[in-house]
Structure formats: structure tokens, C-alpha cells
Design a protein with these regions (language model features):
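Membrane-embedded alpha-helical bundles of multi-pass transporters/translocases
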Residues: 2-244
Length: 245
């Protein structure tokens, strides 16, 4: 007997497009924020690296918190979709802010500005969005083959987006003037792309009714606290570089 299917092809593509949103934030941040901060703003890379490491403390705590909150959420949109939709707006604001550090401020204020928005992005908005996105596979289908397909499509979109971000970003920055304002414009372009693709992903799927879901859905929400991180983005980027070589 064939296992029941829950998703059409456009539902699967729509889900995969959610990793366009994830990578216009994190591929961009992972591969270019240090260059922007050191070469354009003039901050010390050692201090920036330390601030990023400290931020991971908050990140580890927030993983557990948001996993629990999503598990307890009950809305007309479902458990995960609201957490995927609205926090991404915060991702956009934080990403733009990180690439819009006021050049007239003193160094201490600039470090503080970066750290605050980096923590808000990495440990707050992105964590909520990405854990919800990861949990969604268990909430929109009970078909194991479809869940595998969703995961595969997610990787394809992530890999492709990361590769494109690496390939075009320097060219875009140079085109817009190769200065602080140019980085702001490029960040804004990526934010708009991210918001659009994330919204499409959310609206392309509908969570199954609670009485139709089994216990595996709750287990998958907890497992989703292992979210897609900066390290994962870097690994995808390195893999794409090897493919081009």
C-alpha cells in the first residue's frame, strides 16, 4: 500500500525557497561581515571574533527556549509558521543594521552597536525563524519520503544561494561605490530578497491539523533546535568553492 502524499510539487519548492531567506542573511554575514567591519569600518578583527564567540553563549540558550515555545504554540497558522514568518522581519532589520554601522561613531560605540544587533540576530530572530523552518517538515506531512524530499530541496536552495552570494557580492559592492553606503545598499537588497522568499515559503505550506499529527511531530520540533548555523553556512560555502575549482 502506497503511503499517503500530502504535498504538491509547488509546496516542496516553496518550502525549499525558505533557505534562500536563510542564506541571504547568513552566507552574506559569514563570508563578508569581517571584511566589511575591518576594511570599511576599521574595526579590529580579533575583537570582532571575540564578540562573535561571546554571542554564541546566548545562542545556545535561545535554541532551547525557542524550541519549547514553538512546541507550545497554537494559532490558526499552526505551531511553526508564525515563528518562521514574523521573526524574519527582525532578521532583516538586524542584518541591515550590522552593515549600516555609523561611521562617525567612536570605536567603542561601533563595537557595541555590532554586538547588540549580532546577538539579536543570531540568538534571537534567526534562531526563532530557523528552528521553526526546520520543524515544519514534521508538521506539514507524515510521509517520510516527502520529508526527505523537503530536506534535499532545502540543501539545494541553500547551496545555490550561498554560491551566488559569494559570486556576486563584491561586484555589487564595487558597483554601488565600494564604500560604507555600498554595503548598506547590498545588505538592503539581500534583506528584501530574504523577506520575499521567506514569506513565499511560509504561505506555500499549511500545517496539518493537530489530531492528524503523531508524536513524531513534537520530537522533530525538539530535534530542530539543532539549527542551521554560521558554521553550516561556512561549510556550504567551502563546498561550493571546491566545486568551482
Amino acid at each position: 500500500m502506497n503511503e499517503k502524499r500530502y504535498l504538491k510539487w509547488y509546496n516542496k519548492i516553496g518550502y525549499g525557497s525558505g533557505d534562500i531567506a536563510g542564506n541571504v542573511v547568513y552566507a552574506f554575514l559569514t563570508f563578508f561581515v569581517m571584511i566589511y567591519l575591518s576594511d570599511t569600518i576599521g574595526l579590529n578583527t580579533g575583537i570582532i571574533g571575540t564578540l562573535m564567540a561571546v554571542a554564541k553563549i546566548f545562542d545556545g540558550i535561545s535554541d532551547v527556549i525557542f524550541g519549547s515555545l514553538i512546541d507550545k504554540t497554537k494559532t490558526k497558522m499552526g505551531k511553526a509558521r508564525p515563528w518562521m514568518l514574523w521573526p524574519y522581519l527582525g532578521c532583516g532589520v538586524c542584518q541591515f543594521a550590522i552593515f549600516a554601522i555609523p561611521t562617525s561613531w567612536g570605536k567603542t560605540a561601533q563595537y557595541a552597536f555590532f554586538f547588540i544587533f549580532y546577538v539579536m540576530l543570531n540568538a534571537g530572530f534567526y534562531t526563532a525563524n530557523n528552528i521553526a523552518y526546520s520543524a515544519l517538515t514534521a508538521l506539514v506531512t507524515k510521509n517520510e519520503n516527502e520529508r526527505v524530499q523537503l530536506g534535499s530541496l532545502r540543501f539545494v536552495f541553500a547551496f545555490t544561494t550561498s554560491t551566488i552570494i559569494q559570486a556576486v557580492t563584491f561586484g555589487l559592492v564595487e558597483y554601488f561605490g565600494n564604500d560604507a553606503a555600498a554595503w548598506r545598499i547590498v545588505a538592503l537588497i539581500y534583506v528584501v530578497i530574504g523577506i520575499v522568499s521567506n514569506t513565499i515559503s511560509v504561505l506555500s505550506l499549511k500545517e496539518l491539523p493537530a489530531d492528524e499529527l503523531d508524536e513524531s511531530a513534537d520530537q522533530n520540533i525538539q530535534a530542530a533546535t539543532e539549527k542551521y548555523t554560521l558554521r553550516d553556512a561556512a561549510q556550504i560555502g567551502r563546498a561550493s568553492c571546491r566545486e568551482r575549482v
